[in-house]
């Protein structure tokens, strides 16, 4: 199977996995969404494991949790670090939305929802590229993922030491 045909044959699954993340209102700026931050981090670990990571974990921090995952192909291979964030901005003012902000809608060939682009969509593109590389036998490097939940409020995590070397 080619890369293009793998992606095409799995497109619906890829979209549903993305939509499951978008439906979680992981708004880092709102204290009432704190439980959603953990839920979203846990969902990312599930997606990463099902996509081919050898391990994935939610790491507690002083703020919102960090998702760490890795796929090690060889101790001698180079390592690529993939960064994304799972937190989103508040959706207000709600009256400006044509649809519910946390219920993804495909309109005119585009996904409309809070987090569809910044940054859950981008994170999913990276993860599904990783999955496709594994399935097609193309992955020749180690891959580590760091997904954090404080980018939208100033990356407070980075005032602390890195959670992993």
Residue ranges and their predicted role:
Residues 1-94:
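N-terminal helical capping/dimerization or prosegment-like subdomains
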Residues 9, 50, 135-136, 165:
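Secondary-structure boundary motif
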Residues 58, 70-71, 101, 133-136, ...:
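Short, flexible, glycine/charge-rich loop motifs used to bind or transfer phosphoryl groups or to couple energy/partner
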Residues 77-147:
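Active-site metal-coordination/substrate-binding segment of hydrolases
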Residues 151:
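Active-site-proximal loop/turn and secondary-structure-junction residues that shape catalytic pockets
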Residues 158-165:
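Conserved small/polar residues in nucleotide/adenosyl-binding loops
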């Amino acid at each position: 199977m080619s890369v293009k045909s793998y992606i095409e044959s799995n497109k619906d699954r890829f979209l549903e996995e993305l939509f499951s993340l978008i439906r979680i209102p992981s708004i880092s700026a709102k204290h009432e969404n704190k439980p959603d931050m953990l839920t979203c981090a846990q969902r990312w670990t599930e997606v990463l494991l099902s996509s081919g990571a050898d391990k994935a974990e939610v790491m507690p921090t002083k703020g919102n949790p960090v998702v760490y995952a890795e796929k090690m192909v060889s101790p001698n291979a180079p390592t690529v670090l993939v960064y994304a964030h799972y937190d989103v901005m508040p959706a207000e003012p709600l009256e400006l939305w044509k649809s519910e902000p946390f219920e993804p809608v495909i309109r005119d060939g585009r996904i409309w929802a809070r987090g569809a682009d910044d940054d859950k969509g981008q994170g999913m593109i990276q993860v599904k590229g990783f999955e496709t590389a594994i399935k097609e036998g193309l992955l020749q490097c180690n891959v580590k993922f760091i997904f954090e939940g404080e980018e939208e409020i100033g990356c407070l995590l980075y005032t602390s030491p890195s959670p992993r070397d």
